[in-house]
């Protein structure tokens, strides 16, 4: 039988942990937020899958040139979605108006572009924020859950108004 001392065991464990950390690499991320979707919409008057792919590819390549290895994309900014969802309307930040289909799948494109550039991608979700600076439910898409809840007295409390915003 072979015996291992506590010192040898600790050394082996530490070496294994260091090797695992080195193989995973450092976490160097940047955030692609709803402001970046606004920048895309400002740059391209014709909003197509090809234009979005071009825009996001430029963003990813810039991040890569700065040593980043991961992009965190905001996919649920204001009670809406940057992907097709049966629960949340399309985000105004991708299409210009909440509830309007942009005609392509932005999240699919972002995943493809990130992976094509050897970059990891993570989704960022704001689960509670519905609006900032407005409590006007009529500005929300008709299929926005907050608007639906507000329409019924029994569920109105599901959405809170605080500081001129909805949550």
Region locations from a protein language model:
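Short, well-ordered coil/turn segments that N-cap beta-strands
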Residues: 24-28, 67-69, 115-121
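Soluble non-cytosolic domains of exported or imported proteins
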Residues: 46-54, 66, 97, 101-105
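Aromatic-lined substrate-binding rim segments of carbohydrate-active enzymes
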Residues: 59, 76-126
